[in-house]
């Protein structure tokens, strides 16, 4: 005989519909309203029935909880209910009978009701529904939930929660979307099981393919484990809908490195599903004026990231630094970012400082494996990009050659990358593209110029437009360089140092055009190139200086500019000295009133360096 303890009362979950209701069973409901012929009872937000006045057994008011038995479900969907008075019973939740599917399988479920389990990657409130971005082991999908226009649906659901979504697969604006009936947070063993399943699957999915570098190189072979690690981190960020900020030095080498990675990441974002324009708000490439991550850079990036986190419910970003990020000059920015637990990976060829790695989760640098700055950031970035998404290889394999000539690499890898694309791009063509990049980026300032840069690098497929654009940019750049050189070269001062090095000095503040192309750094480089040709086979050092800075270029003198700058910082009190760069190419900053003292101390150090015989 059944006792009250054995009586089961069913509670319909939010996503349940009429197909989940059974005649004869008792359900927990809520009084919705009254009519002359009875009382309307809601079993959930979607289902209601009528308790005829002859079947009512107690007095009620709106929103009272009641127990009702389903007497009949009519062909038209109306439900006849009968009130039940039971003091002791057990409540059992009824979940909607929906098949749990992977996000990757949703295109085959159009028009059907499904269940999806995954992690909340983004919560965006629109003027209409709330859009939840859900990530599972197979992909990313938007879920629309609507209460009323502009009102946050399911406020209890937060970022990074593991949830179960029940809803119908629909097409909205030619884009797949789940229109939710119910979203519930999983907890306990169910949450752990789903999170573990997703983590394990994503970890395997993020593993890069086993591929070799484009060219034969001991340095690149030795760097492959770290490049694979960095590529895996980036791939996992894409698969979990984590925003990515890519910062790079604003020269040809840095641009080539960053654009190679950009092509790989953007194409991977598009392949992973989600919004059709996800590559624009989940990925941002930004040039840095200095060859290190300045306070100005981290301030801008943090400002954007925090606003996007608050306004659009995005995760905090993964930051990729390329052609910068390896030196002590980057440390103040890393310290600020660490307050917000922002992860960093670095792909750089500047001489690294040991204190930096504690801030990074991945660091590709040729110095770590016995290489040097001749293996440029553009070469490294392209190899990492191939690991991120091998399908972009044919589009980007010319970028290392451009980066190598643009950064004046003398490493054997430069010639190998040039040989790789010689049938399409001559060495002169690569030099022209590198110059065009430098020239165009000067006018772009802090803008990435995504589409213009793609045309300069011939990534769009319009060869005729690429050729016309590069020719125009090179013509403009060379004209301005010649104007600058005609103004500068007569004012170069020469000295012969005790070690036999030929030192040349040019005050670019008073003997060069300001606020135009080429800027002081490139002006100093162009002066240096001309002086090297005039002094073929001799050790040459060029310093282009202004009121509070100096730019160094060297050939045949064994200097270590970062170390020299650190030593001068300690040896010249009141100099306010900072700077760095590569071993033989770099810059130094100081206070204006100490310029002469600092420059003489710098020249003394250069004179103590050994020279190439």
Q: Model-flagged regions — what are they?
A:
Residues 1-117, 122, 126-130, 139-150, ...:
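Single-stranded RNA-binding regions, centering on S1/OB-family and related RNA-binding modules
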Residues 144-146, 253, 267-345, 352-355:
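N-terminal small/polar loop signature for handling phosphorylated ligands or for N-terminal nucleophile
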Residues 199-246, 254-255, 263, 267:
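An N-terminal, well-structured beta->alpha segment
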Residues 345-346, 350-365, 560-574:
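Flexible glycine/proline-rich, aromatic-decorated loop/lid segments
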Residues 206-217, 276-286, 505:
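Gly-rich Lys/Arg/Thr-decorated short loops/hinges at beta-loop-alpha junctions or inter-strand turns
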Residues 239-246, 250-252, 354-510, 527, ...:
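A structured phosphate/pyrophosphate-recognition subdomain
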Residues 52, 142-143, 362-371, 383, ...:
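Short beta-alpha connecting loops at secondary-structure transitions
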Residues 502-613:
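Glycine-rich, acidic loop segments that terminate in or are immediately followed by a histidine
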